[in-house]
A protein has these predicted regions:
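Phosphate-binding beta-loop-alpha motif at adenosine-nucleotide cofactor sites
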Residues: 53, 163-165
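Charge-rich, low-complexity N-terminal segments
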Residues: 5-86, 92-95, 125
Length: 183
């Protein structure tokens, strides 16, 4: 039974899984691979994004591992033997998000001219950071200047750049991470 207490509390997000409706609460199967996230996504186009991006990344040599962040299940993609993921696909109460571990946003800025407005908007956004930024001990935040304003993306609790992915924009996500992967 996949809904035993240990599984239920290890993956309390089973309630978002459509399989609860097609199977039942006590026999609902939990998916493996990228379907671990896709099964919790409500939109068919978003499930397709998960599948397409997973195929591209795994065929490019990335290693896929399950992860659960605070808001829902995730699948994380690691390059080589790195202990830090480059990409993550997250289901936040059924909404899909892609995390990009861009460490040097400055290297991405020229390429943004080729990107759709939805991606450019992610770089316009700035967040306040967490307590580590406030006390001067942050090692993972990304600071850059965009459109003559200083921007900040906290990277302490996840990858600094988070967006709702669109299938047609996948090549842009890959290129942005390629450009901004290293400091």
């Amino acid at each position: 039974n996949y809904y035993s207490n240990s599984i239920a509390f290890g993956n309390a997000f089973i309630g978002w899984n459509y399989k609860v409706l097609t199977e039942n609460l006590h026999t609902c199967t939990l998916a493996e691979g990228c379907d671990y996230v896709a099964d919790k996504i409500h939109d068919e186009a978003d499930r397709e994004v998960v599948s397409v991006l997973d195929k591209i990344l795994t065929e490019s040599g990335y290693t896929r591992k399950k992860g659960d962040f605070n808001e829902g299940p995730s699948v994380r993609y690691y390059c080589g033997k790195s202990s830090v993921y480059d990409y993550a696909l997250n289901s936040d109460t059924g909404n899909l998000y892609l995390e990009l571990r861009i460490r040097n946003a400055e290297k991405c800025l020229a390429y943004l001219r080729e990107c759709p407005e939805s991606i450019v908007e992610v770089f316009r956004h700035s967040d306040a950071g967490c307590q580590n930024r406030m006390n001067g001990t942050c090692r993972y935040g990304v600071k850059y200047e965009f459109e003559k304003e200083e921007k900040w993306h906290c990277g302490c609790c996840g990858a600094p750049f988070k967006l709702h992915p669109i299938k047609e924009d996948i090549p842009h996500y890959l290129k942005l991470l390629e450009l901004g992967r290293s400091k």
